[in-house]
Curated annotation (Swiss-Prot):
The protein's name: Glc operon transcriptional activator
Reported induction: Is constitutively expressed. Is repressed by the presence of glycolate. GlcC exerts an autogenous repression on its own gene.
Keywords: Activator, DNA-binding, Repressor, Transcription, Transcription regulation
GO MF entries: DNA binding; DNA-binding transcription factor activity
Gene: glcC
Length: 254
């Protein structure tokens, strides 16, 4: 809604921010065309461009040379951060991260089961089916690819929560989250019993979300991460060293 008392650029910027918070505009996806945004928001092209300039200045919208504008990733922990270093050198950091994942992903699954749209479920299903196909062609898929598919499945559920603070929180920890998934894949996927357990738990999460069973989905997601934590801890108790190499996600995207 237009406000005569405020600069038009601020009004436009706030309208676009609301689309981001509501999940209409998603992190990393190209923005709709200027024409479509103008039609949706009811502003002129010149006003829209002024608003986008404000958002670029705030770091909310980014435009790479020769590419479309998109919603920026907010507050991401970079692969050079102290947390990434601690992840690869200090055993407790992995377990602390898994505790955080259990809380955040449990809530993501609960909200996704409650608020997820059919379009969200299509994305989740696509990610789940790709993950299943990779498991069936185990010898042809690298561990990093397995981890990417696993991470994408959990991220799709998070995005279906439509809680943008939760989405931004998880995305700000993308490299850390991916490395916890990679640690799980690297240390557990070659153990048949643990791999079957992970597959069953992924199926429970998927089915509970799509069947709109929020509390079942929350419990399934939490149990999954906590089981991974226990299995990794058991490996260390057996006297084996965990593989916990820090691998920035963006360096491994195909």
């Amino acid at each position: 809604m237009k406000d005569e008392r405020r600069p038009i650029c601020e009004v436009v910027a706030e309208s676009i921010e609301r689309l981001i918070i509501d999940g209409v505009l998603k992190v990393g996806q190209p923005l709709p065309s200027e024409r479509r945004l103008c039609e949706k928001l009811g502003f002129s092209r010149s006003a829209l461009r002024e608003g986008l300039t404000v958002l670029r200045g705030r770091g909310i919208i980014e435009t790479a040379q020769g590419r479309d504008s998109r919603v920026a990733r907010l507050n991401r922990v970079q692969d050079t951060s102290p947390l990434i270093h601690l992840f690869s050198t200090q055993p407790r950091t992995l377990y602390d991260l898994l505790d955080v994942r259990a809380l955040l992903e449990g809530e993501s699954a609960r909200l996704a089961a409650t608020l997820g749209t059919q379009a969200d479920f299509v994305v989740i299903t696509r990610c789940y089916e790709k993950m299943l196909a990779a498991s069936e062609n185990n010898k042809e898929i690298s561990l990093i690819e397995h981890a990417q598919l696993d991470h994408a499945f959990h991220l799709a559920i998070c995005q279906a929560s439509h809680n943008q603070v939760l989405v931004f929180t998880l995305q700000s920890l993308t490299d850390l989250m991916f490395n916890s998934v990679f640690a799980s894949v690297n240390n557990l996927y070659h153990r048949p019993q643990q791999k079957k357990q992970i597959d069953r738990q992924h199926a429970r999460i998927y089915n509970a979300v799509l069947q709109r069973l929020p509390h079942v989905a929350q419990r399934a997601a939490r149990d999954h991460v906590r089981t991974v934590k226990k299995n990794l801890h058991d490996i260390e108790l057996e006297g084996h060293h965990l593989i916990r190499s820090a691998v920035p996600l963006e360096m491994n995207l195909s």
